[in-house]
Structure formats: C-alpha cells, structure tokens
Amino acid sequence: MPRNSNTAVKNRPKTTAPKVEVAAEERPLMRGADIVIKCLENEGVEVVFGYPGGASMELHQSLTRSKKIRTILPRHEQGEAFAAEAYARVCGRPGVCLATSGPGATNLVTGIADAFMDSAPLIAITGQVPRPMIGKSAFQETDVFGMTLPIVKHSYLVMNVEDIPRVIQEAFYIASTGRPGPVVIDIPKDVQQSSCRPVFPDKVNLRGYNPDKRISDIAVNEIAGLIEKSERPVVYCGGGIISANASAELREFAEKTNIPVATTIMGIGAIPADHPLSLRWLGMHGTVYANYAVDRADLLLAFGVRFDDRVTSKVSEFAKHGTIVHIDVDPSEINKNKVAHLPVVSDIKYALQQLNKAVKGKKFEAWHKQIAEWKAKYPFRYRVTDEVLKSQYVREFLRGDVNEIIMPQYVIELLDELTKGDAIITTGVGQHQMWAAQYYKFKHPRMLITSGGLGAMGHGYPAALGAKVARPDKQVIGIDGDGSFTMNIQELATAHIERIAAKAVILNNQHLGMVVQWEDRFYQSNRGHTYLGDPQNPHQIYPDFVAVAKGFNVAAERVVRKSELRPALERMLAANEPYVLDVIVPYTEHVLPMIPAGKTVREMIIEKDETPNLGDNKGL
C-alpha cells in the first residue's frame, strides 16, 4: 500500500481477516455509532478529542455511555486535531479526533496535513450526511474523503454498518505501522444509526500492505565496510528515529562507531543535546558545526530523514563530497530529493540493531578535533544589538534601562535551567520555534512537539493540551509567539474546563517576527502587514493576553523587565493549573545562524552579516 491509498469501503474488496466464530443469533444487535465506540475501546483508546455537530452527534451520544474513553471538548476542530496529533507523538499511540461533516471536517484539514507531513499516527473520524444525500449538496456536505486524498495515509468512506469493525481495526493498524500517518474514516449519519450484529475480526490481513521492511545482511555488511573506510563520517537522522522508538539503538550505534550525530528539528531528542557526539541539529537555523560537518563529510549516514529543503537548502550542494547511505521505511522517500549511493528500505530500528552487531569503532581523531574547533568557535550565541538598544521596547517599555532587556533566547535558556531540560515543549511556528530548538537542551525523544513539515501557526497551545493529557506527570509548556498563540487562543477554555495544566510562554514582540526577519534580510525592511499591534495606539501592548486569559479563568501575568522573569517563570512552573506568561521582547532580534533559502553553508549568516570562515576544501 503506498503512503496515500484511498478507497470507499463500498467499492473495496473484502479482506480475508479471520472472524470470531459466534453464531449470529448470539451476537448482540448494536447501532453503528455504538459499534464505532466499542471498536475504539477494543483498540485501547483512552481519549477522544471531539466537537459535536449534526452528522456526528450519534457518535457523541455513544461516547457518553463509554466507561473507558474520556472525551475532551475543544473549542475549534483545528485545536482538536493538533491536540490529538500531539497526544500521539508524545505517547506513540494513535490520537483520535472527531468532527461533524462540512465545516467541522474542513476545520480538521490543517491538523491532518500536519500529521501527514510529520508522520504522526492520527485517526480522524468525521460524520457525513446520510447516504441518499451524498453528492446532492446537502446541508453541511463536503467531500472530506476526496478533499484529504493527498494528505492521508489512507481514507475510508463507510457505506455499510457491517464494515465498521474491520475498517477501524485496519485504520489503527495502517496509521501506526510502517511510516506512521493519518487515516480518515468518514461515516454517514444513517450508517451510524443503522443496526447489525457486528463481527469483530481477531487480526488484520491487508493484502499488498507490508510495513515490516528489513535491511539485508548484504546491505549491513556494505555499510559497515563504508564506515571502516571513512575518515569523516556523520550520522544525519530525523523524525523516523523517534517514530520507530529507535533512539537507544541510535545512541548505541554512535557510541560504538564514534560517529558524530546531527539531527533534524523533527529528530531533536533522538540523542541528548549534551552528548559528546551530538552536533545538535542542522539546517537553515541549525548549528554551524552540524551544517559544516555534513558539508565536509566523506560518508553521510541518513537515517529516517527525507532531505527536505529546510535542511538541504541548495540540494545539489548538500553533502556533495560524501557517499550517501539512506535508510528509510518509506520507499517513496528514497532518491526523491537527493540521490543515495546506497539506498535501503527498512525499519530503522531493525536496521540499527543489525548494524550494531556488525560495526566496529574507529577514533576519527582528526575529524573530532576539527569538529571540536567548530563547536568552540561557533556555538549558538546572541547579544544585545544596536537595533535592540534603539527599539521601542527599550525606549518606552523599559524607559531606557538596558539592564532590564529580555532577549527571547534568554527566556528559553532560563526555562531550560529551571526545568532541568525535562519538560515537554510544544511550539507554534516562527522565530520562537527556532529559539526553542536552539536554546532548550532536549535530553530525550518525544519532548519537542512542533510543526515541522507543514509549519502551521496555531499549533503550539493545542499541542500542549494534547501532550499534557498524554503525559500528566510531565511539565508541559507551549512556547509561542503572539501571532501564533492568537490563532488558537480559544483553547484556553479547553484547558480550564478540562483541567489540563498546560502552560504557555508567549514571546510577544507585537510582530510576525520571522516574516519581519525576512523583510529585513531580503525586502529592505519594508513592512508588509507584519505589525500585530494597534496602529492607532502603538504605545499599548495589544492584545492584552493577561486580560484575555483571565476571561477564560486561566491564570496569567505579563513580564516586561528581566528582573521579573525568573520569579514569574517559577510561579508558572509551580502552578498546578493552566497558566499564561506574556513575555515582552524586542521585535528587532533575528534568529541566527541562518542559511538563506536556496543558498549553501558557505553563505550562512552567523551574526549580523558575518559568515563563517570555515576554510577551504583541502583534504577532501
């Protein structure tokens, strides 16, 4: 089955899944909606994020009778999709979201696309208009099946009530095996209302779908040989490591071979940030030393990655000096963006287990010496620039007191210190996302939940809710920008009503910061609708997030001065309830380093207009 494989159940050949042999007259008569909920219980579902409507209310009525499933009512379907996706990414099991037909289903689309791009197992169940009304432009009818074809792993339109048990069992299996992804199950209202004596299959048997792909012994030996011959190897790994629960195997591989490891943003946590072999992460805003190590590598071991443009930039120049080994469970990713010299389709956990039996260690002394020099010379760093000193933030909010400036990077550093790097961090999309990845030192997988491939603003706080539901024992903090936070601010109501103690730290610069940065770099600082404050009252911080939060009965406070920050963060972290901390920061700060789109590592901007002096290519 390809990554996208979609069929209406009425037109789909029956699978040959064995069925429990129970005489029909002995099986209880059940309504379709009750069968759906029973199937979810059978799959071990503990939480459903759902917003009811006319075409899905039968399912919600059935949920009220479930003793095993907690139903969380969000305040927008996009919020529920992000929450369910984050729940899945934190606990590793499929998240479930539920919406009605029409606008309810379309509001899920961004979350479904996000799960598809970032390979998260998501089950999106939608109500649909009754079967006789399909295709007749009925009230709240949309073709969610067709609409989501490019952004799902599989889709079902359930036209027969008897198919529900098989469909749901298949959906969970498909979503969580191979490369994880979202599955849509569209169920017409009259199917939910129909009755049958259901048969629950005891296992899934999908002909043509074989997610259990394994590396060959020949490939293992070839990779071991390449490592033996290499002088400058680098492991480049991504979210595939985390999805496969292969972080322990990756660390063992790195320590056995003594090969440095660079991750993508989606792979952050696959190896501890403070591990001696960690290069942190690479790409547009990644470390100088990770980017340059990949550029200089004579062997690139690409594990569970897709060579996306935010990592490779000018792809023809990416890792052009080295032999590329690409291992991924999804064959469609092999040679899609970058041709590999040794392509391998395999489950990465199994591949690493086999490699760990075959590889031998080397010292790579010269290589590690070079990397140590780059690390010492080019750490993540920031300073108070002239632009910050001249900013409205300093002039008006601080009355010129430069000792009280709050740099956004410092907020993340302090949060890392106070939580000892052990919090689950979710983000929206923008500058704050990059600073969170740069300055929070993640030690474990499934601790950074961000929107990577799709880059969806509004992701941060709903994701924090889903993460906190999945791990109520952990401190969960949504780091957001004022633009991104506003997009799903209504989920503060969900946090309060459902008693979900997820925190929010807003790096509030009154602008769309990342777009402003690009305006400064590439558009002569011409502002194209990136100011989020009140133009008629620029001296006011707008909106008043503290007042808004308190309107939802959520605790909140604003921080303007550096001396206020530590005690405010301590109060937030000590609170056993939802909490919003609105931190005012200057908008003139840029995320650095930065490789401009389509450029190379040699055109990386490090500080203001400084580019790295990384030497020539002698010895390559």
Residue ranges and their predicted role:
Residues 35-45, 86-92, 116, 174-179, ...:
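Glycine-rich phosphate/diphosphate-binding loops that line cofactor/substrate pockets in enzymes
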Residues 4, 126-167, 189, 267-377, ...:
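Glycine-rich, acidic loop regions that bind phosphate or pyrophosphate groups
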Residues 10-27, 162, 198, 321, ...:
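Phosphate/pyrophosphate-binding active-site segments
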Residues 89, 241-325, 433, 441-473, ...:
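Glycine-rich, anion-gripping cofactor-binding loops and their flanking helix/strand elements
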Residues 57-131, 133-140, 289-308, 335-337, 343-345, 434-513, ...:
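Thiamine diphosphate
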Residues 33-37, 41, 45, 59, ...:
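Active-site diphosphate/adenylate-binding microenvironment
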Residues 142, 170, 174-229, 368, ...:
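Conformationally flexible catalytic loops at phosphate/diphosphate-handling active centers
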